Every structure is written in structure tokens, then in C-alpha cells.
């Protein structure tokens, strides 16, 4: 059923709940399950408390892993006409304090059990959602926001610098959810397996809001690395829709029994490049194709996705309905023809209005209505998008630009790896290669690179190839570029 994109998230939430109040709605790995009516009732209790006790606060924080409680907290904030700010509880105090200060957070919704497990200091007034009074007045008196009101403030992953506040409106999220629904239509018989955190845009839009907006059930677990629990959860709830990342999917292919994922129909992966070796390993184990997609937090996040009936190997699919993708010269931003590689620019109804309290950053990032992604790629003649690298993932050696991704791909069947450029007095930069399979000698890695047909300039020296325990990753599963570069500098 097509959903209105000129409404608000709260209006759509109520409409779905009132349409079939007794249908199961949300569940999690703790065993908690709510019907649509119960979900709405609990969200209204949160909203009522916020309206009575936090009337003057525009932004409300949330510090919870993906769960029924986290969903209810976010829905309650929305019903109260306020803005949800889901905090990245894995990023450390400095990142969290910066987010709290930028958004002026005075209240953070959490739970006693979660705080105790996390060991996080009280950085604002921490309110345990489970302790809110059950007799609280419902949210009937909430000021009704408009579709252009800010629904949430997310933060960039900070892989290449200081995280930025990214506001998304009700209209942004509704349009993005509708775009995915038109590309891969769900039904009320479907169940989403939701394991990505709500502070990640992929998790916020597509695991928190997409299921409830389209009448799907959803089953949550708060740690995407808990393969055993995720397998049990998928089997128990007969999950059909799953959002993940290639890194996590590779773990699942090695730790989850094939029958546990047998009900899954659609597995969408994003946040990093889907390598052929990972896709092949997953299909061999589960018999399911991974569907590569592409997005950015600033774009809602969804931009493009492959489907089971329309896919191109190596691509991230065609743009979602209403999304305009332009490939441009990185220096001049002049449009390029199909097949030509350039900077990926994107516009559409899910594009953020601008960075939060950062007009200069917004002017740099949005040109002629298009968001400048910082990613390089091309469109083929049929409109399929191919992402080749991030512009930040190049090194300048002796005046020549050297991409890091082809080097990593040359040894991806041997070992996970990461290439970074560190300062070098003679050549400007020097390539450092980190890999995580210490039983393979660095000489073998070097030999494989020499045989891969890469230009000699692209191949790190033998002494610059280092085995490490792990390559730092973000909660989304993609490489934490900043920390990985710091690791490369420390060993190089």
C-alpha cells in the first residue's frame, strides 16, 4: 500500500496502528513483543511525559541499543513533536559530549540496565524509559509538526574527520522509506530483522521507521556481531527482510546455520563495498543473493539498490524513485557522460536541508541542490550506479594519484586488508598495508600484489606490509578510516 509522503511520521504511525491494532508489531531478543496498539500506547506514554515535563526542550537524546524500548522511545519523541537524537554510545565520551553540546541536549532517554552494562557517565539528565509512570496522559496535546519539521539529528560516522550533525525531516524519511518500498515492495506478512543501531542512518530510517510505516513486523537485537543470537532471532520470527553490511554478513556466513536464514527473501547491504568474495561466500552458505545498495546519511540514507529481479554485479543498483544522480568532474562539477568516472552528486526528496548549525559546511556540501558525496563512480547506459572509491581514499605518490581500493581488492581472497597513505619526505606519501591474517607472511602478500597486474607505483614495499590483530571498524561494520589511519601511522 502506498504511503503518504506529505504527512508526518507520527501521523503515519497512528494510522498504521489504528488500522490493525491487534497485529504483532515489534519484538526483540529479550522476548519482549508488542502489538501495534501496545506499541502506540507505550509511545504515547513517553510523548505525554515529554510534553508535561520537557515542554521547552526541542531535542531529546536517546542512548539505547536497537530494541523494543529504543523504538518506543523514538516513537514517543516523534509523537511529542520533538526531534530525536540517537547517541553513538560506542564512540567515546568526546564524541558523545560534542553531540550533546551541539544539540543542546538536557534530557536523554535510556534504561537502567543499559547504562549499567555500558558503564557510561551521566552526561545529561538520564531518564529510564521503563521508569516513566504508566498513568501518564497521552500525547493528544502535542503541537503537530509539519512534514518539513526536523524528525531526527544523526551524525556522520566521522571516518574522515569530526562528525557533523545531520538533520532529517519527516518528509526526508517518509520519501526514503517510500522509495525503498516501491523498489522492493514489503507486505504486512513480512518481518524485518533489525540489528543496526538507530544512531546509524541505515538503522534509523530502514530498521526503525520503514517496517512500522509499511505494516511489517520487526525483530530487534542490539549487537550486530552476536551472530548466534541473530540466527536464533531470524529463525524464531521467520524474518524475511534484513539490512546489514558486508562485514557483518561475512561473519554470519561463518557462524549461522543455513536453516536459520531460510525464511529471508531480501538482504540489503550497504555502508561499504560488497566484494565478490563476500557475496559468493554468503550465497554458497545460505543460497541467498546479497543486494548491494548505496547511500549517505545526508541523503536519508538510501540512494540506490539492486533487486532480485534487476541487478548488475559490481553495481549498487539503480537510484530509488525521485533520486537524481549526477556524475561530475571532481574539480569543476560539470556533468559527465555515462561510463565516465567522476564525483557522485545526488539530489532528491530525502536530501537533508543542511548540516545542523553549520551553514558554511552546508554551502560546501550542497551545490546547485545536489549533495556532493565525496565518492567516485559512474553510471552505465542503463542507469546502474557503480561506486569505485572515496576521493579521500587516494594517495599522491610522486605526483600521481594512487587509489587504495584496487590494492585491497587484489588480496581480498587471501585476507581482509586496509591501505593508508602516511607522510613521506621523499615522495609526499607512502603506502602502508595492514592485514589481519598473521599466519600469512607479509612476503606472500607482497608476492600476490606483484602478480596482480597493478602498476608498480601502487604496490606497497615489503617492509610496509604489516599483520595486525584487527582493523578498526565502526558499529555499522565499515572501516573506521580515522582510527585505521592512526594504526597505520603507528606501525609505519
Predicted regions and their residues:
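Conserved AMP-binding/adenylate-forming core of the ANL superfamily
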Residues: 14, 24-54, 61-71, 75, ...
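Conserved AMP-binding A3 loop
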Residues: 33-37, 151-178
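AMP-binding/adenylate-forming catalytic domain of the ANL superfamily
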Residues: 429, 454-478
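Conserved AMP-binding/adenylation subdomain of ANL enzymes
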Residues: 174-191, 199-240, 255
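Gly/Ser/Thr-rich phosphate-binding loop
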Residues: 239-244, 253-312, 324
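Conserved ATP/PPi-binding loop(s) of AMP-dependent carboxylate-activating enzymes
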Residues: 318-322, 334-364, 397-402
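AMP-binding/adenylate-forming catalytic core of the ANL superfamily
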Residues: 108, 242, 348, 353-354, ...
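Conserved pre-ATP/AMP-binding loop-to-beta segment of ANL
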Residues: 6, 21-22, 137-162, 182-191
Amino acid at each position: 500500500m502506498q504511503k503518504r509522503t506529505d504527512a508526518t511520521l507520527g501521523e503515519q504511525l497512528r494510522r498504521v496502528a489504528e488500522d490493525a491494532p491487534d497485529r504483532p508489531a515489534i519484538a526483540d531478543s529479550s522476548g519482549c513483543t508488542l502489538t501495534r496498539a501496545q506499541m502506540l500506547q507505550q509511545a504515547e506514554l513517553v510523548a505525554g511525559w515529554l510534553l508535561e515535563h520537557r515542554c521547552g526542550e526541542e531535542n531529546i537524546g536517546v542512548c539505547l541499543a536497537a530494541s523494543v524500548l529504543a523504538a518506543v522511545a523514538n516513537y514517543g519523541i516523534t509523537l511529542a513533536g520533538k526531534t530525536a537524537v540517537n547517541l553513538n554510545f560506542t564512540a567515546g565520551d568526546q564524541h558523545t559530549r560534542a553531540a550533546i553540546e551541539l544539540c543542546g541536549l538536557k534530557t536523554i532517554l535510556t534504561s537502567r540496565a543499559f547504562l549499567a552494562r555500558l558503564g557510561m557517565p551521566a552526561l545529561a539528565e538520564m531518564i529510564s524509559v521503563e521508569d516513566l509512570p504508566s498513568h501518564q496522559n497521552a500525547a493528544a496535546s502535542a503541537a503537530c509538526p509539519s512534514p518539513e519539521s526536523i524528525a531526527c539529528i544523526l551524525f556522520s560516522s566521522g571516518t574522515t574527520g569530526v562528525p557533523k550533525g545531520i538533520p532529517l525531516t519527516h518528509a526526508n524519511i517518509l520519501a526514503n522509506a517510500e522509495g525503498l518500498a516501491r523498489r522492493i515492495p514489503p507486505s504486512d506478512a513480512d518481518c524485518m530483522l533489525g540489528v543496526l543501531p538507530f544512531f546509524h542512518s541505515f538503522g534509523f530510517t530502514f530498521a526503525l521507521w520503514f517496517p512500522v510505516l509499511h505494516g511489517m513486523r520487526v525483530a530487534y537485537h542490539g549487537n550486530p556481531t552476536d551472530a548466534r543470537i541473530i540466527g536464533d532471532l531470524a529463525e524464531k520470527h521467520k524474518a524475511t527482510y534484513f539490512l546489514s553490511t558486508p562485514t557483518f554478513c561475512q561473519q554470519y556466513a561463518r557462524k549461522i546455520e543455513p536453516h536459520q536464514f531460510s525464511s529471508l527473501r531480501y538482504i540489503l547491504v550497504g555502508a561499504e563495498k560488497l566484494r565478490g568474495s563476500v557475496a559468493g561466500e554468503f550465497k554458497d552458505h545460505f543460497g541467498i543473493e546479497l543486494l548491494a545498495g548505496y547511500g549517505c546519511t545526508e541523503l536519508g540514507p538510501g540512494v540506490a539498490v539492486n533487486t532480485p529481479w534487476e541487478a548488475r554485479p559490481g553495481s549498487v543498483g539503480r537510484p530509488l524513485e525521485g533520486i537524481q544522480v549526477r556524475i561530475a568532474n571532481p574539480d569543476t562539477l560539470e556533468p559527465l557522460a555515462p561510463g565516465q568516472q567522476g564525483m557522485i552528486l545526488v539530489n532528491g526528496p530525502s536530501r537533508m536541508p543542511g548540516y545542523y548549525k553549520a551553514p558554511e559546511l552546508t554551502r560546501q556540501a550542497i551545490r546547485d541542490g545536489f549533495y556532493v558525496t565525496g565518492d567516485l563512480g559512474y553510471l552505465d547506459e542503463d542507469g546502474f550506479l557503480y561506486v569505485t572509491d572515496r576521493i579521500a581514499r587516494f594517495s599522491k605518490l610522486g605526483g600521481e594519484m594512487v587509489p587504495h581500493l584496487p590494492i585491497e581488492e587484489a588480496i581480498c581472497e587471501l585476507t581482509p586488508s586496509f591501505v593508508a597513505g602516511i607522510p613521506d619526505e621523499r615522495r609526499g606519501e607512502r603506502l602502508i598495508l595492514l592485514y589481519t591474517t598473521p599466519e600469512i607472511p607479509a612476503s606472500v602478500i607482497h608476492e600476490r600484489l606483484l602478480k596482480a597486474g597493478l602498476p608498480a607505483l601502487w604496490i606497497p614495499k615489503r617492509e610496509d606490509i604489516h599483520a595486525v590483530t584487527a582493523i578498526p571498524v565502526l558499529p555499522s561494520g565499515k572501516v573506521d578510516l580515522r582510527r585505521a589511519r592512526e594504526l597505520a601511522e603507528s606501525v609505519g
